């Protein structure tokens, strides 16, 4: 178990002013240090999580030919199915040992090229509804966390609201299949940083997630039962000029004796609308911390990163 702070989300969502201030302080300390926290008492339904994992395992258990029918050209994996070995970490040509399914915003802020229709699975009638319900719950928790982040950054509490309402967030169900041959240099997910503002991860089905701490040591992360793992992504790191850390992480292969087991993971990547500028906040720039990143919009940054990880040509 890694020493990732476990925060009581109820302090923020239901607490007194003092408790809210305590939560903001704890959140800020963690995000400016290692960029990861776990939260408890968050309100995400355990029944919703269990149903989601059940539906995901049902889908990935379908025949390859059936799954392939839901892999849609031209969407860069942003909706529907992406087959095994298509994605790789930035700067690493070895393919990740995974397949995945992505669901996007059911209520887009506007009509734009980044928004695509979600895909239904004919063989699993309740599949889309399960994902929509989880998406909406996780989006709500994420938006509340962004309010706490805004307070820590001395911004208006609703600073992020207009940018994330109807934003381009993604719920991704990932299946890491059993390893049947020597994987060589490939791992289940190569070391990387997330693209988005923050990521919310419900309990994965097996060990394997590791985070690179500031001492350059890999530490294993296991979600405490009933908690969500929430980490900073590159967009928030850029916006805060590196004040908040988008930490490198990976999913390593299991010990050889457990190669025959699958691993499932379902992260929610909270994205803003594509129009949001990721220009560094003025109060995060100083003589000691000069501006570190070029100005770019969230949409253009996403496009750039999708190319780097092999999902877009």
Task: Report residues per predicted region.
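Peripheral, non-catalytic segments flanking oxidoreductase cores
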Residues: 1-313
């Amino acid at each position: 178990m890694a020493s990732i702070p476990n925060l009581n989300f109820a302090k923020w969502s239901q607490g007194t002013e003092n408790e809210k201030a305590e939560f903001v302080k704890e959140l800020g300390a963690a995000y400016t240090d290692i960029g990861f926290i776990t939260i408890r008492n968050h309100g995400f339904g355990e029944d919703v999580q269990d149903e989601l994992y059940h539906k995901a395992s049902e889908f990935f258990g379908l025949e390859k030919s059936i799954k392939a029918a839901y892999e849609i050209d031209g969407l860069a994996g942003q909706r529907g199915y992406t087959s095994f070995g298509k994605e790789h970490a930035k700067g690493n040509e070895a393919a990740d040992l995974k397949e995945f399914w992505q669901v996007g915003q059911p209520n887009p802020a506007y009509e734009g090229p980044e928004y695509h229709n979600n895909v239904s699975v004919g063989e699993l009638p309740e599949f889309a509804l399960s994902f929509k319900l989880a998406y909406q719950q996780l989006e709500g928790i994420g938006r509340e966390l962004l309010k706490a982040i805004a307070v820590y950054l001395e911004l208006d509490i609703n600073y992020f609201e207009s940018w994330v309402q109807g934003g381009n967030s993604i719920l991704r169900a990932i299946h890491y299949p059993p390893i049947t041959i020597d994987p060589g240099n490939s791992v289940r997910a190569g070391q990387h940083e997330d693209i988005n503002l923050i990521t919310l991860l419900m309990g994965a089905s097996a060990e394997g997630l590791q985070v690179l701490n500031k001492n350059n040591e890999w530490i294993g992360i296991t979600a405490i039962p009933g908690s969500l793992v929430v980490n900073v992504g590159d967009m928030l790191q850029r916006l805060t000029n590196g004040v908040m850390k988008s930490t490198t992480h990976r999913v390593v292969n299991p010990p050889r004796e457990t190669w025959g087991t699958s691993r499932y993971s379902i992260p929610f990547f909270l994205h803003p609308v594509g129009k949001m500028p990721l220009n560094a906040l003025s109060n995060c720039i100083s003589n000691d911390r000069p501006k570190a990143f070029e100005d770019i919009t969230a949409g253009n940054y996403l496009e750039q990163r999708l190319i780097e990880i092999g999902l877009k040509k």
